[in-house]
Amino acid sequence: MMGCWILNEGLSTILVLSWLGINFYLFIDTFYWYEEEESFHYTRVILGSTLAWARASALCLNFNCMLILIPVSRNLISFIRGTSICCRGPWRRQLDKNLRFHKLVAYGIAVNATIHIVAHFFNLERYHWSQSEEAQGLLAALSKLGNTPNESYLNPVRTFPTNTTTELLRTIAGVTGLVISLALVLIMTSSTEFIRQASYELFWYTHHVFIVFFLSLAIHGTGRIVRGQTQDSLSLHNITFCRDRYAEWQTVAQCPVPQFSGKEPSAWKWILGPVVLYACERIIRFWRFQQEVVITKVVSHPSGVLELHMKKRGFKMAPGQYILVQCPAISSLEWHPFTLTSAPQEDFFSVHIRAAGDWTAALLEAFGAEGQALQEPWSLPRLAVDGPFGTALTDVFHYPVCVCVAAGIGVTPFAALLKSIWYKCSEAQTPLKLSKVYFYWICRDARAFEWFADLLLSLETRMSEQGKTHFLSYHIFLTGWDENQALHIALHWDENTDVITGLKQKTFYGRPNWNNEFKQIAYNHPSSSIGVFFCGPKALSRTLQKMCHLYSSADPRGVHFYYNKESF
């Protein structure tokens, strides 16, 4: 079992542990450096260990902010995916977990930002208290430095008769830190699954606060509020000898007044590369936005699904890819992802859109799919398309046997795949590694996806005509029905075609017994590498992942299930 788990999750776990290890190393190394570095000895007298907590978390923040944009650089990921020479097997599957890594890094940013904020609140209070009459001895002497000419200050809070909020808003670090914190809270809270499903538009717009976040981060350290003793001062001022003789600093030659300077800002050095890379992503998107998209066909399905056929010069796709669509008439900023439902062999590319939010509802209305007459081609709203971008499903043809599982709306990515399989099977001269496909479709109401049932019916007919019915084995499971449907199904059970879908393969009612299904597939294909591809809810994803671990053989010559989850 452990060997099978390593087969699917080993590399992912190594990468996550490496990320954690780098974070821990950076934090611990920086923490102890600031705890022991001689140039920050007097700073520690005022701030104590919270100096090290603030600086260590700041470095980890910089590291994670450097990483956060890379997983969402779609063109970069698609380029790496297309370069199969340097990206094969398990490494290739890691690209499909880009959003998971993006979220993981975001949690790292949130944790380190919290530590950084709390530590600096303590630092600010310590700076403020050090200017009070209660502060005595070396602490008071250090806080008074900078009050006379030719002295540099250590304590940025210059007077006690003030409050910490005022002092916070007087500094570049304070203002930008506040902006960074607010931006981070907005981004994190609007990224919850509930918000994304209830209002994708809110998620989309608030996520663009990242521009403010990165700008503020780049200038956050320019105020140089955390100060340490200069190297020239250290060579003249022996801390071990002079720290207890602070009253004699101006009179004893061996103890000149220590001089301090702020640390140079470094955050911009960490984020410059990824920001430039992401800026290139946006430039490419703008360039594609300018390209003309011709809408060749609009189909309004009875189930409330809008099918759009489009053409665009130079557009090349692979089955399973997706595009980003913008409709300037609805919003000039929003781009929404849709899986391509056409095959590469067709002379157009298509998407199927179901109303699932304000933007999609407005799009269906604009195209006349909400009970209105369909628009004339010349009056259709303009669409812009960015992509296509690769996903896990593009790797289907790398396996001899594939298990494809779709749940609900997750069936959409498999439309292009099944079409492409048909075209490849029809072309005798095309070498095809894939020899068997098991397709499972689980839905609550098949009528909501009539267009897909029609596609399956067409494929079934064509496969039968070509004598290749063995190539595709499909299983449809209906999880929701009422008494009238049950009675209707029972009355027509003996007919040659299914009463719900019209297919020769009868619909099952309930949910699959995945243990039985995987056991049978493993029995049918011993010593095979089987790709399992899924698009749907998380609960079912965990079940399928478990099945892949359970039924993969520890023997290298046995059957192996490789799990791939669709995400975009």
Curated annotation (Swiss-Prot):
Q: Which residues form the Ferric oxidoreductase domain?
A: 55-284
Q: What is its EC number?
A: 1.6.3.-
Tell me the membrane topology, using the record's own terms.
Multi-pass membrane protein
Gene Ontology terms: cellular component: cytoplasm; extracellular exosome; NADPH oxidase complex; plasma membrane
GO biological process terms, alphabetically, are: defense response; detection of gravity; otolith development; superoxide anion generation; temperature homeostasis
Ranges per topology, Cytoplasmic: 1-13, 73-103, 189-201, 417-568
Q: Classify the main location.
A: membrane
Under the heading CDD domains, the entry gives: NOX_Duox_like_FAD_NADP
**SUPFAM superfamilies in UniProt:** Ferredoxin reductase-like, C-terminal NADP-linked domain, Riboflavin synthase domain-like
Query: What quaternary structure, including any partners, is listed in this protein's UniProt entry?
Result: Interacts with CYBA/p22phox. Heterodimerization with CYBA/p22phox is essential for its activity and cell membrane localization.
Function of the molecule: NADPH oxidase that catalyzes the generation of superoxide from molecular oxygen utilizing NADPH as an electron donor, upon formation of a complex with CYBA/p22phox. Plays a role in the biogenesis of otoconia/otolith, which are crystalline structures of the inner ear involved in the perception of gravity.
Q: Supply the name of the protein.
A: NADPH oxidase 3
Q: Which gene encodes it?
A: NOX3
